[in-house]
Amino acid sequence: MPAARGKSKSKAPVTFGDLAIYFSQEEWEWLSPNQKDLYEDVMLENYHNLVSVGLACRRPNIIALLEKGKAPWMVEPSRKRRGPELGSKDETKKLPPSQCNKSGPSICKKPDSSQQKVPTEKAKHNKNAVPRKNKKGHSGKKSLKCNSCGKTFFRSLSLKLHQGFHTGERSYECSTCGQVFRQILSLILHQRVHTQNKSYECDKCGDIFNKKLTLMIHRRSHNGKENFHHEKTSDSCPSLSPHHNNHAIDSIHQCRKCGKVFSRMSSLLLHKKIHNRKRIQKYSACGRGFKKKPVLVHKRICIGKKTHENKALIQSLRQRTYQSENPFTCRKCRKSFSRISALMLHQRAHTSGNPYKCDKCQKDFGRLSTLILHLRIHSGEKQFKCNKCEKVCNRLSSFIQHKKIHKRKKKLIECKECGKMFGGMKNLKVHLNIHSEEKPFKCNKCSKVFGRQSFLSEHQRIHTGEKPYQCEECGKAFSHRISLTRHKRIHSEDRPYECDLCGKAFSQSAHLAQHERIHTGEKPYACKICKKSFTQRISLILHERSHTGEKPYECNECGKAFSSGSDLIRHQRSHSSEKPYECSKCGKAYSRSSSLIRHQSIHSEEMS
C-alpha cells in the first residue's frame, strides 16, 4: 500500500472524477437543505482547486448544474466515484491571510464581510480544523481527554462531538473507527473510506486519506508554506511570491450586482443569496411582503383556506381584518354563503335530494364521504364489532361512542332545582354549584338571574334573536356554540346511540333517553300547578309559561311577544313573507311545515 509521507511526491494525475460524488434522485431527496448546501460547497471548491493548479481543462456537467442552482442528480451517474467525506476533518481549507509572506507586495486582503456573515456547515468544520499551538497533537500523543468517560482524542472537534453523546446532542459515530460526525451524510461518506484502500497518510497527525489531492489540501492546515499551488503558478507572475500568485488566480469571481470579488465560486454563490432575499412580493390585501412561496401560504390565510378546529373563531377574526363578502346566494330563501360548496349543501335542504347513490343497494346519501363509509359494508372492509351487542361500526370513532351506551348502566340522577339529569353523583355535585352560588347578573327583560356575565350574555340572545354561530354545511345559525356542535352531528350522520326496541338511532345519549320514554310511557316532568306531566323538561317550561303568562320572545318589528322561540320565528315570516317550505310537485310554498304537510295530502289523494 503506497503511502505519501514527508516530501514524497507522486506523478499520478488527479482528475475531477477522483473527487466527484454522484447521487441518484432518490438519494438526493433524502438529503436535508444544509446537507445539499454542504455538498454544493465542497464540489465547487474541489473543482476550482483543480482549475487553479491546472489539473482540470473541461467544465463537468455537474459543475454547470450546481452553478445554475439545478439538482445535480440530473447528471448521468455512470461515472460514480468515491470522494472525500463531507463535513469531516479533511475538507478543503484556504490559507489564512495572517500567514501571508509580508515581504512581497501587499496583495492579501481581509476576508469579505459578506463571506463572514454567511455561516455554513463547512465553515464550522474548517474553524475547528485550525492547527493548535500545542505540538503534542503531532507527536502521536492524545492530549485531549473527555471528563465524563476518560477517552482521549487528537482534535478538539472530535472531543466536542464525542461529548455530544453524554449531553444528548445529536451526533453520528462511525462503528469502525469511532469518529463522530454532526450529519448523517458526513458519516455515510466517511464510511466509504473503510471500504477502499487507504493509500495516503499524513506524516504529522496520522490521518489517512484515499485521495492524493485530499491529503495535499489537508497538509495546508499544518503548514501554510507547503502550498501545492506554487509549482504551477510561480511562473505566471515572476514579481510575486508563489503564495501571492494564489490570490491573484483565485480572486476572479466577481458579483455583477455589487462588484464584490471572491476567491471561490461557492462564496460568490452564497453572497448572491443576499440579493435574492430582497426580491419580495407584496400581498395586495394586507400589504405584507414575502418571497415567492411564503406569499402563497399567506394568501391562503387571508382568503380563509386554512383548516382549524375553531372555525367560528377564525371566521370572526377574518371579518374584523377584511371585509367579508358572500357572493353565493340561494334563489329560494335568499341566504348567502362565502363558498359555493356551502351553497350546494344548503340547496339540498330545499330539494331533499341525495346525489350520491350506492350501486349495490340503491341507498342514497347526501355526502360523498358517507357513501364511501357505507360501501365498506359491501366490500367487507375492516369493521368494528361490539362484543356485547354484536353491533358493527364502520368507523373507530362510532365504535367508541357506541361502547359508551353499555357503560351507561347507572340510573340517571335528577337535579331537584332544575330537573336536569346526570349520569353520576360527581357530575351532579359539580352542577349544584350553579344553584348555590350568588347570581348578581339579572336579565332586564325576563328578570332571570345568573351567576356569571357570560351566562347572562348567552341568555340575552334569546330576546335579541342573535345567532352568531352558523353551520357551514347548511347555513343554519345558533345562539350557542354547544348547539352548533350538536347540530353538526346531523351532517356527519354519526348516530351511535340506538334504541333496542325500535332500532332508531340518535347522535346523543340524552336524545336516546328521551326517546325511550315513548316506549315506557314515563313522564318525569310534572307541572306543580295543574299536575300535568311531560316527557321532556322543555315541554314543561313552555307549559308553565301558560300559567305565568311569561312571553320572553318579542318581535322587533311589531313588538308582539311569544312564549317560545319557534312561535316568534313563525311570526317573523309574516313580516318578511318568507316561505321556506315548498312543494316538490307543484312548487307552492308555505311558511309552516304543517301547512306543507296538509297540502301534500291533496297530491296523495289524487294519486289514489
Curated annotation (Swiss-Prot):
GO cellular component, one term: nucleus
Disordered: annotated segments: 75-143
One Gene Ontology MF term: RNA polymerase II cis-regulatory region sequence-specific DNA binding
Start and end residues of each KRAB domain: 14-85
Compartment(s): Nucleus
Zinc finger (C2H2-type): 144-166, 172-194, 200-222, 253-275, 328-350, 356-378, 384-406, 413-435, 441-463, 469-491, 497-519, 525-547, 553-575, 581-603
Biased composition (Basic residues): 124-143
Pfam families listed in its UniProt record: KRAB (PF01352), zf-C2H2 (PF00096)
Primary subcellular site in the record, as a coarse category: nucleus
One BP annotation, GO: regulation of transcription by RNA polymerase II
Amino acid composition bias (Basic and acidic residues), ranges on this chain: 83-94
Keywords in alphabetical order: DNA-binding, Metal-binding, Nucleus, Repeat, Transcription, Transcription regulation, Zinc, Zinc-finger
Protein family (similarity comment): Belongs to the krueppel C2H2-type zinc-finger protein family.
Function: May be involved in transcriptional regulation.
UniProt name for this protein: Zinc finger protein 667
Organism: Rattus norvegicus (Rat)
Gene assigned in the entry: Znf667
